C-alpha cells in the first residue's frame, strides 16, 4: 500500500479476545501509522469540566451516544486490535485481517474529501438532541444492547459508501453492528 488509507478496525473487549468488539474508522498515514479515528462512544457531560467525557460502555439513564473525531477530540483515540505499539501501526492488523482497508492510495486531501460525508453525519448524530459542543446525540442503550457505537460505525460506512467489512476471527458479540443512527435515505 502507498499513500493514506481509510480503514475499518476494532477494539476487542476484553482486549485481544473474541468476545465482543467496538468498531471504528481509522485513518492511517503512508507509513501505516493510525493518525485519526471516528468513534461513537458512550458519553456524559461533566458539568465541572464543562466537557463531554466518554467511557467504555453506557449503563446509566443519563449516558449518551455521541460521535467523535480524534482530530478535534484526541482523548477519544481507542486501542486498535492487531496494531503494533508504540505508534499504532496498523499494517500488521491489515495483514492478519484484524483490520480492513476500505480505500487506499489516497492523498491527505482525498482523505478529507472521503471523510466529509461521514463528518457531516457525525455532526447530525450529535445534533439529534440539544446539548453543548454540537449536541447530546442519542440515549445510549443499557450495556450497549441496541443502537450503539457499532451502529455509529455502520452509519459512517454508509455515509462514505463503503460495504461492511468482514474481520478475521470475528468477535462473537457485536451488538448494533448493522443498525444506522440516521435514516439511510438522508445519509450522504
PLM regions and their residue ranges:
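Non-catalytic ligand/cofactor/substrate-binding and regulatory segments of enzyme domains
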Residues: 1-144, 159, 181-188
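Active-site or metal-binding loop neighborhoods of secreted/extracellular toxin and effector enzymes
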Residues: 147-188
Amino acid at each position: 500500500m502507498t499513500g493514506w488509507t481509510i480503514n475499518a478496525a476494532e477494539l476487542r473487549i476484553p482486549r485481544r479476545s473474541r468476545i465482543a468488539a467496538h468498531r471504528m474508522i481509522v485513518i492511517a498515514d503512508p507509513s501505516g501509522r493510525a493518525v485519526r479515528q471516528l468513534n461513537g462512544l458512550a458519553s456524559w457531560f461533566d458539568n465541572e469540566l464543562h466537557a463531554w467525557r466518554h467511557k467504555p460502555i453506557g449503563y446509566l439513564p443519563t449516558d449518551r451516544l455521541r460521535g467523535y473525531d480524534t482530530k478535534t477530540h484526541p482523548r477519544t483515540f481507542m486501542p486498535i486490535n492487531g496494531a503494533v505499539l508504540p505508534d499504532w501501526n496498523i499494517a500488521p492488523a491489515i495483514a492478519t485481517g484484524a483490520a480492513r482497508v476500505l480505500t487506499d492510495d489516497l492523498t491527505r486531501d482525498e482523505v478529507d474529501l472521503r471523510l466529509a460525508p461521514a463528518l457531516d453525519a457525525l455532526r447530525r448524530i450529535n445534533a439529534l438532541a440539544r446539548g453543548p459542543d454540537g449536541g447530546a446525540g442519542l440515549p445510549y442503550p443499557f450495556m450497549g444492547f441496541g443502537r450503539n457505537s457499532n451502529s455509529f460505525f455502520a452509519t459512517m460506512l454508509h455515509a462514505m459508501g463503503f460495504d461492511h467489512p468482514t474481520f478475521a476471527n470475528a468477535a462473537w458479540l457485536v451488538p448494533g453492528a448493522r443498525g444506522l443512527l440516521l435514516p439511510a435515505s438522508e445519509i450522504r
